[in-house]
């Protein structure tokens, strides 16, 4: 392998020098995924389309360079890690290509959550439904043959794939859905076709082999390759397509995937049962299965304790918990209410004594119950001892053997020093997960893990089970594929690999082990960095909502980078520190959206703010204090400067770009025509006499301005809902401009100043405009604080609408998501428009107050998918934060206004 050889070859094939530039940061953050392994790649690359992947594999074949494809990085068995060339196939593969009535075609980087969001309007969904929907990509789900909570083996990736565009190891491309695809396949890969037909005939002719394959795949099974395809399909093209499912990047690359769709059932009822012990719960399993529910999820007592530590257990559950209690979630779904009611009645009759929540249909409570299970892995992993790495095992046994399996697994964990394990899983399918943790700091601990694994393998196989049900073989179970399949079928697995990948360059070491001890090598050591992020298990749930994903780093990658910074030698630390200034700091919007999806409630933005504060000097902290003291004047002058710039837009744009070119990156704001320059003095806003409401206009009004605010206040006064505005607010600011930049002393002074003001208004409900200002101010006191759009939604929504809007497109804000204020924007939009659209691709715009002016590529990156989704939509576009409106206007090229302005237009 020659890393320079493959880069030189890629340059000859048309890759730019910029795209081939290597980064120490990227190598280190891509050396880890959600698994317990760590392998640093020699080379990294981002692919933008299937043609680039074709050229990458052509170059890799010519230079014998190992290639590993990395998408969501949420896999738990080490299959997205490699020593050769690691290729990101998420950032550039985000298109939902075509939605039809029975199928959807999408690129592999689209998360399952976002894909289902696009299908929601048609009441359809894809089959695989892993707990990691927000992180798991379509390519990863198919590559691992993901299943999940409800799909079982009936609707998993294998069962629902229709076709794909496949890139073979030598770079050749085959579209399996073209009319002449089989003919083309035979011409393109005659040796592969012949070998597939030979293996098919061999398995079918041998009754014992056929029976064993059937047995192995009756349960969930992600060990080895999908050998059941040789029994399920005659046509080599169909065998090819289904062998790719679960192949974990070892047979080729899926550049575009077509999946069959399932209907979303119209009504659902969720039940939560508590049994006195794990054994009693498992003994009840066959009776529960006989009721034919859509899902059965088990959580043992240790799981419940971990959930309780995060305050995620409802009081009703806590009240009935005993020492060994085990919870089971059972869900029924149907297309008709009566059908659902009948199923629920039958179930309640059998299990009335165990039901804590019965037949829950209200979405908020249903979601709360399911959040317990979906976030469980990361929450349990958070509770691990400091400095240890979490290992989530994943096995399947016949459901009737679950009781003995759980009992024996618990005994094994105790025997090998892991204590009482955490056990949970999809028990309808006999699929259980159990978590252990270890620091692997000594040879003795590694030996303990080796002995534990050997005993676990023996136990599961003795029960007729499978060693990996959902998480893929990866490196974790590759040495045990022969034990799972037997010698004869293992030889067939090796023949499949050889036929697809004769040079062995595709993800070597995955599925077919590089050594018998591969599962004991390259084990991840977790470094302690900061209390804010130390509980991170690197699951990747945070990544899909991050505005810098695909541009620089994601929240998980920022955390990993700083973990690596703490352990690397001085020479690497120097380079890493330099790269992280832009990749980790300057391109972090600190919006906190990562916390929304994080199961353990980590706000990486807070961590980055802390880093910024540490990097501030005495001089910059002092200048921050001066700015805070004179903030009213600064905001007013900034507004005037923007108005002047608006009069000479070309000069302003050119001048700011020239200045930015000669100053350090991120120091000079770049003027844009999307900037609204209507700043006004807050003292001119109309104040009413009110004992109930006090309005604190944000300083953004001085800078950018929203003239509709004055009209909102006038309408409120006229409608008998007057709003009082305190005097002397010239210097008022929530403090976000200081906290976001790490100017802690200035922020503390502003917070102290605000405290006196808020105390004087403690008898009133506080109102502030702008969702980001609302979020910050809400955290500074216990006084009820609402965003101005919430005031309108709660008090003025009955005012008659005179002009209804045809279609409104909403851009929810990250801060509005955190506080719940986005719901007010939705309510107002539904009141004034016939049609309201929330884009499936919305995420934080990355403007972050002024970050979009300082690092404009951040906003362009963050808004690109949302802009593309809406390119042909004729609508009024609104949001509820002035900086976000500027960011969205600039990023999409379409003007965004405030929801308040839209409402004022409609009622005036």
Model-identified regions with their sequence ranges:
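Terminal amphipathic helices with adjacent charged low-complexity linkers/tails
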Residues: 293-386, 421, 425, 555-563, ...
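N-terminal flexible segment immediately upstream of the FAD-binding catalytic core
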Residues: 1-58, 62, 72-102, 131, ...
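Iron-sulfur cluster-binding electron-transfer modules in prokaryotic oxidoreductases
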Residues: 501, 604-908
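N-terminal glycine-rich flavin-associated loop
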Residues: 35-67, 89-130, 146-198, 263-276, ...
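Iron-sulfur cluster-binding cysteine motifs and their immediate structural context
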Residues: 504-510, 541-565, 587-614, 776-778, ...
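A gly/ser-rich beta-alpha-beta helix-loop segment of oxidoreductase catalytic cores
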Residues: 36, 76, 119-163, 168, ...
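Non-heme iron-sulfur electron-transfer modules
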Residues: 512, 518, 549-583, 601-627, ...
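Ferredoxin-like iron-sulfur electron-transfer modules
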Residues: 518-538, 568-590
């Amino acid at each position: 392998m020659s890393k320079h050889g493959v880069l030189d070859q890629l340059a000859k094939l048309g890759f730019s020098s910029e795209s081939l530039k290597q980064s120490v940061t990227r190598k280190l953050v891509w050396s880890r995924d959600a698994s317990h392994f760590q392998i640093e790649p020699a080379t990294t690359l981002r692919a933008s389309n299937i043609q680039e992947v074709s050229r990458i594999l052509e170059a890799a074949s010519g230079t014998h360079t190992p290639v590993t494809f990395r998408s969501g990085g949420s896999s738990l068995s080490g299959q997205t890690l490699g020593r050769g060339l690691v290729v990101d196939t998420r950032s550039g593969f985000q298109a939902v290509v075509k939605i039809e009535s029975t199928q959807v075609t999408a690129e592999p980087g689209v998360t399952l959550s976002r894909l289902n969001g696009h299908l929601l309007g048609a009441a359809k969904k894809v089959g695989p439904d892993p707990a990691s929907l927000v992180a798991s990509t379509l390519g990863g789900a198919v590559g691992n043959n993901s299943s999940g909570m409800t799909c079982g083996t009936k609707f998993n990736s294998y069962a629902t794939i229709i076709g794909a565009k496949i890139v073979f190891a030598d770079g050749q491309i085959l579209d399996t859905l073209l009319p002449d695809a089989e003919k083309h396949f035979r011409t393109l890969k005659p040796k592969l076709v012949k070998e597939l037909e030979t293996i098919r005939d061999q398995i079918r002719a041998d009754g014992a082999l056929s029976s064993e394959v059937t047995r192995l795949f009756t349960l969930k099974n992600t060990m080895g390759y999908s050998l059941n395809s040789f029994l399920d399909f005659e046509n080599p093209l169909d065998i090819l397509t289904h062998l790719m499912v679960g192949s974990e990047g070892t047979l080729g690359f899926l550049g575009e995937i077509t999946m069959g769709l399932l209907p979303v059932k119209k009504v659902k009822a969720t039940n939560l049962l508590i049994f006195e012990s794990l054994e009693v719960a498992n003994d009840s399993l066959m009776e529960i299965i006989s009721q034919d529910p859509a899902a059965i999820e088990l959580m043992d007592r240790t799981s419940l304790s971990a959930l309780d530590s995060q305050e995620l257990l409802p009081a009703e559950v806590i009240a009935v918990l005993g020492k060994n209690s085990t919870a089971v979630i059972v869900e029924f779904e149907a297309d008709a209410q009566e059908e659902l009611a009948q199923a629920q009645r039958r179930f309640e009759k059998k299990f009335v004594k165990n039901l804590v929540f019965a037949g829950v249909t209200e979405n908020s409570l249903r979601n709360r119950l399911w959040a317990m299970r979906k976030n469980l892995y990361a929450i349990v992993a958070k509770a691990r001892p400091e400095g240890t790495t979490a290992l989530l095992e994943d096995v399947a046994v016949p459901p009737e053997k679950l009781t003995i399996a759980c009992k024996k697994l618990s005994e094994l964990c105790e025997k090998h020093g892991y204590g009482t394990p955490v056990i949970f899983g999809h028990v309808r399918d006999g699929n259980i997960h159990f978590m252990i943790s270890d620091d692997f700091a000594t040879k003795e601990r590694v030996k303990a893990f080796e002995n534990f694994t050997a005993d676990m393998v023996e136990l599961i196989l003795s029960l007729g089970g499978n060693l990996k049900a959902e998480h893929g073989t990866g490196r974790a179970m590759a040495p045990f594929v022969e034990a799972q399949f037997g010698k004869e079928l293992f030889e067939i697995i090796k023949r499949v690999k050889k036929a697809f990948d004769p040079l062995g360059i595709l993800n070597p070491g995955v599925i077919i082990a590089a050594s018998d001890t591969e599962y004991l090598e390259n084990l991840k050591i977790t470094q302690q960095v900061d209390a804010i992020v130390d509980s991170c298990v690197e699951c990747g749930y945070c990544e899909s909502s991050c505005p810098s994903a695909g541009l620089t780093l994601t929240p998980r990658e920022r955390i990993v980078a700083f973990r690596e910074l703490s352990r690397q030698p001085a020479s690497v630390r120097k380079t890493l520190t330099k790269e992280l200034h832009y990749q980790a700091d300057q391109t972090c919007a600190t919006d906190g959206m990562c916390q929304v999806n994080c199961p353990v409630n980590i706000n990486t933005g807070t961590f980055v703010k802390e880093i910024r504060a540490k990097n501030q000097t005495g001089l910059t902290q002092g200048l921050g204090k001066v700015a805070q003291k004179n903030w009213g004047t600064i905001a007013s002058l900034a507004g005037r400067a923007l108005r002047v710039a608006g009069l000479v837009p070309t000069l302003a744009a050119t001048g700011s770009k020239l200045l930015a070119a000669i100053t350090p990156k991120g120091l000079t704001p770049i003027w844009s025509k999307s900037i609204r320059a209507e700043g006004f003095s807050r003292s001119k806003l109309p104040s009413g006499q009110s004992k109930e409401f006090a309005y604190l206009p944000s300083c953004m009004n001085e800078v950018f301005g929203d003239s509709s605010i004055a009209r909102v206040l006038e309408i409120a006064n006229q409608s008998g809902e007057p709003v009082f505005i305190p005097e002397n607010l010239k210097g008022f600011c929530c403090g976000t401009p200081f906290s976001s930049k790490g100017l802690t002393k200035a922020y503390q002074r502003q917070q102290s100043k605000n405290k006196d003001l808020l105390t004087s208004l403690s008898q009133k409900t506080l109102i502030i405009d702008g969702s980001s200002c609302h979020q910050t101010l809400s955290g500074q006191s216990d006084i009820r604080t609402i965003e101005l759009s919430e005031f309108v939604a709660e008090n003025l929504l009955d005012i008659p609408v005179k002009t209804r809007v045809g279609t409104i497109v909403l851009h929810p804000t990250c801060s509005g998501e955190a506080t719940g204020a986005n719901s007010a924007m939705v309510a107002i939009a539904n009141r004034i428009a016939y049609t309201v659209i929330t884009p499936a691709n919305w995420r934080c715009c990355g403007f972050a107050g002024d970050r979009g002016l300082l690092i404009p590529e951040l906003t362009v990156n963050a808004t690109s998918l949302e802009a593309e989704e809406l390119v042909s939509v004729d609508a009024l576009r609104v949001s509820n934060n002035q900086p976000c409106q500027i960011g969205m206007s600039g990023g999409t090229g379409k003007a965004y206004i405030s929801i308040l302005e839209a409402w004022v237009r409609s009622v005036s």
